């Protein structure tokens, strides 16, 4: 009797929904990102799960606010994930 789903080759969407420890290959959910300030356009490196308020170095504008998990970016801020 064949299985209904392939356990060795799960789809990427299934893997993303699983807990970080129960994935086929374990990896964390957090990452570093470059955040561009909407006022002075300087780029700052911010941790995705920052636990403190992060302000811009140039103009002291708040870039992100901590929440229970991921940090919430301020409106107007753009970001991209840093590559390894």
From Swiss-Prot:
Pfam families in alphabetical order: Ribosomal_S27e
Keywords, sorted A to Z: Cytoplasm, Metal-binding, Ribonucleoprotein, Ribosomal protein, Zinc, Zinc-finger
SUPFAM superfamilies associated with the record: Zn-binding ribosomal proteins (SSF57829)
Gene Ontology cellular-component annotations: cytoplasm; ribonucleoprotein complex; ribosome
Cofactor(s) required for function per UniProt: Zn(2+)
InterPro entries attached to this UniProt entry: Ribosomal_eS27 (IPR000592), Ribosomal_eS27_Zn-bd_dom_sf (IPR023407), Ribosomal_zn-bd (IPR011332)
Main location: cytoplasm
Biological process annotations from GO: translation
GO molecular function, one term: zinc ion binding
Keyword Metal-binding on entry: yes
Record PROSITE patterns: RIBOSOMAL_S27E
Zinc finger (C4-type): 37-59
Cofactor note: Binds 1 zinc ion per subunit.
Cell compartments where the protein resides: Cytoplasm
HAMAP family, alphabetized: Ribosomal_eS27
Family according to the record: Belongs to the eukaryotic ribosomal protein eS27 family.
Subunit annotation: Component of the small ribosomal subunit.
Record's function text: Component of the small ribosomal subunit. The ribosome is a large ribonucleoprotein complex responsible for the synthesis of proteins in the cell. Required for proper rRNA processing and maturation of 18S rRNAs.
Name used for this protein in its record: Small ribosomal subunit protein eS27
UniProt source species: Homarus americanus
Gene (UniProt): RPS27
